[in-house]
């Protein structure tokens, strides 16, 4: 008798597959790209078993392709995720995740006294990566926050 477990998630014909997202981050990624408001079919796998991560999240978005700009934003949430572009059921392109040097208008500054609160100014952060840790420095109040603090507010 075999003790194999087989996981199946339906393949998509055209679109994007984002795999190896750390567990409990998949929903944040959906909201970041506003995929929760799309009319396209989205397949979500949460807390799936992963030999590398223990557990992971997975997103499959039909007829939608992640841009390089979106991939750099994704790198803040899941720097080791894989992004595959699918055409006719085949992986035609793997999009590398590269941390942006700067990110503007995506996240709120956690500092309630920052000028970005209450003024018509887009937030702007310098991205600092050191020894595997990601920090964001606000352009206006110059406070430095861990990536988790800033992205949890989004």
From Swiss-Prot:
Record's keyword terms, sorted: Metal-binding, Pyrimidine biosynthesis, Zinc
Residues annotated as binding Zn(2+): 109, 114, 138, 141
GO cellular component, one term: aspartate carbamoyltransferase complex
One GO term of the biological process aspect: pyrimidine nucleotide biosynthetic process
Pfam families: PyrI, PyrI_C
Origin: domain of life: Bacteria
Cofactor: how and how many bound: Binds 1 zinc ion per subunit.
GO molecular function terms noted in the UniProt entry: metal ion binding
Cofactor(s) annotated in UniProt: Zn(2+)
Function: Involved in allosteric regulation of aspartate carbamoyltransferase.
Quaternary structure annotation from Swiss-Prot or TrEMBL: Contains catalytic and regulatory chains.
PANTHER family xrefs: ASPARTATE CARBAMOYLTRANSFERASE REGULATORY CHAIN
Family statement drawn from the similarity comment of this UniProt entry: Belongs to the PyrI family.
Name of the featured protein: Aspartate carbamoyltransferase regulatory chain
Organism: Aliivibrio salmonicida (strain LFI1238) (Vibrio salmonicida (strain LFI1238))
